[in-house]
């Protein structure tokens, strides 16, 4: 008699719902998943090894490219580790700016996650709405750093520069006439803080729009409720952090438990779920966007009232300002030496972790007293979540696999490193 065996097939690495170069070896019995074996490494770029051959200040840009949806949050973890080794603390204004941009980054991440998650499950409209809001936040990145994604804005000792007094403006083109451009530039007449304040005033109603399309939608709930359940106890055992852990009912958030930057000075709540399924992960991230909006408004109010320095006054670490560097020969040499050779970091080791949008993003640095790190180890926030794919998917239908992958919010820049 012929042996009856399960069917095995490849999911990815070129699948549009794989969220990057993910390859899953899926074993099914009919339509029911029996086993999943994730294969990673297709986006490995040896970031940790590259950091060992570069001065400390030249590796900040690599952090942007790990989780390339949560750029400044990655920078924050790396910069905090260097500041621990150097024994320095940034000015309070720089802390508030970092807090504000960490939360802008959180909203950027969650908007992309929500749009992609909805699209994977079959809801096209939300995807378009989310990218509409992301444009405004990308413009905030561009205003402070000149780049829409890879900002390299956080520096050991503070931030690259203070917030600008004006916003980039749209110009007439073949697609937008002067009347349309004038309307598009209405919110851009003031400073960056004015623009962010205007966005935070509009954003809660926009979140309501997303919820009106999804939260009580019968099809959405059928595709997400009771799918990919992880209990609180099991989530802790698997090393879950961030929204994945909180959706399982564990109230753990580094911003509250181990405050950094200005998080101990702002008021916000930690949303938690009950069931630990795809639907709870959605609800937790939706509420996180509301709380991030609340934090940003508090930061804007404080920054308007409290001008001050955004970088420490230590010329062994901080290069001269560009205006000074272009006028003075000694400042030019100083600037050149710091950016090419960097600075000496005392011997020691430090671990710094931040509550990145996907979970705990940690950076462990070992210094041997040189201008380059002896070893850099990155704790990717979403790595443990992907490792639990087999447990979350077993017993579900093939169609549920896509919903579970998109609910865990993975980016292979940081998983493969």
UniProtKB/Swiss-Prot annotation:
Enzyme class name: translocase
Topological type in the membrane: Peripheral membrane protein
Catalytic activity: a quinone + NADH + 5 H(+)(in) = a quinol + NAD(+) + 4 H(+)(out)
Places the protein is found: Cell inner membrane
InterPro entries in the cross-refs: NADH_Q_OxRdtase_suD (IPR001135), NADH_UbQ_OxRdtase_49kDa_CS (IPR014029), NDH1_su_D/H (IPR022885), NiFe-Hase_large (IPR029014)
EC number(s) given by UniProt: 7.1.1.-
Keywords: Cell inner membrane, Cell membrane, Membrane, NAD, Quinone, Translocase, Transport, Ubiquinone
Coiled coil: none
Purpose: NDH-1 shuttles electrons from NADH, via FMN and iron-sulfur (Fe-S) centers, to quinones in the respiratory chain. The immediate electron acceptor for the enzyme in this species is believed to be ubiquinone. Couples the redox reaction to proton translocation (for every two electrons transferred, four hydrogen ions are translocated across the cytoplasmic membrane), and thus conserves the redox energy in a proton gradient.
Alphabetized HAMAP family for the sequence: NDH1_NuoD
Name listed for the protein in its UniProt record: NADH-quinone oxidoreductase subunit D
Organism listed in the record: Coxiella burnetii (strain CbuG_Q212) (Coxiella burnetii (strain Q212))
């Amino acid at each position: 008699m012929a042996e009856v065996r399960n069917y095995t097939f490849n999911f990815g690495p070129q699948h549009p719902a794989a969220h990057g170069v993910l390859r899953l070896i899926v074993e099914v019995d009919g339509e029911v998943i029996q086993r999943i074996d994730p294969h990673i490494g297709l986006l490995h770029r040896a970031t940790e090894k590259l950091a060992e051959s570069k001065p400390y200040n030249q590796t900040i840009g690599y952090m942007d490219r790990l989780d390339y949806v949560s750029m400044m949050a990655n920078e924050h973890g790396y910069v905090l580790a260097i500041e621990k080794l150097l024994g320095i603390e940034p000015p309070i204004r720089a802390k508030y700016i970092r807090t504000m941009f960490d939360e802008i980054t959180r909203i950027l991440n969650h908007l992309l996650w929500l749009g992609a998650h909805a699209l994977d499950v079959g809801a096209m409209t939300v995807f378009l709405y989310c990218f509409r809001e992301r444009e405004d936040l990308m413009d905030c990145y561009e205003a402070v750093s000149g780049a829409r994604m890879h900002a390299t804005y956080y520096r050991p000792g503070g931030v690259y520069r203070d917030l600008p007094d004006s916003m980039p403006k749209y110009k007439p083109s073949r697609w937008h006439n002067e009347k349309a451009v004038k309307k598009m530039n209405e919110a851009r007449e003031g400073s960056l803080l004015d623009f962010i304040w205007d966005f935070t005033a509009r954003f809660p109603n926009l979140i309501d729009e997303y919820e009106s399309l999804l939260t009580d939608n019968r099809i959405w709930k059928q595709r997400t409720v009771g799918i990919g359940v992880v209990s609180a106890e099991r989530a802790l055992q698997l090393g879950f952090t961030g929204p994945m852990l909180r959706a399982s009912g564990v109230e753990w958030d580094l911003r509250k438990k181990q405050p950094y930057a200005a998080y101990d000075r702002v008021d916000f709540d930690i949303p938690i779920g009950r069931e630990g399924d795809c639907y709870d992960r959605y609800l937790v991230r939706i509420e996180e966007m509301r709380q991030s909006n609340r934090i940003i408004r508090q930061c804007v109010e404080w920054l308007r009232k409290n001008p001050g320095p955004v970088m420490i006054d230590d010329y062994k670490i901080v290069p001269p300002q560009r205006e000074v560097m272009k006028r003075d020969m000694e400042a030019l040499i100083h600037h050149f030496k710091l950016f090419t050779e960097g600075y000496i970091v005392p011997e020691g080791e430090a671990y710094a972790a931040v509550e990145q949008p996907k979970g705990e993003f940690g950076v462990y640095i070992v210094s041997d007293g040189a201008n380059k790190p002896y070893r850099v180890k990155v704790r990717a926030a979403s790595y443990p979540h992907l490792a639990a794919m087999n447990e979350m998917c077993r017993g579900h239908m093939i169609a549920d696999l896509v919903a579970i992958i998109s609910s865990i919010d993975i980016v292979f820049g940081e998983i493969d490193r």
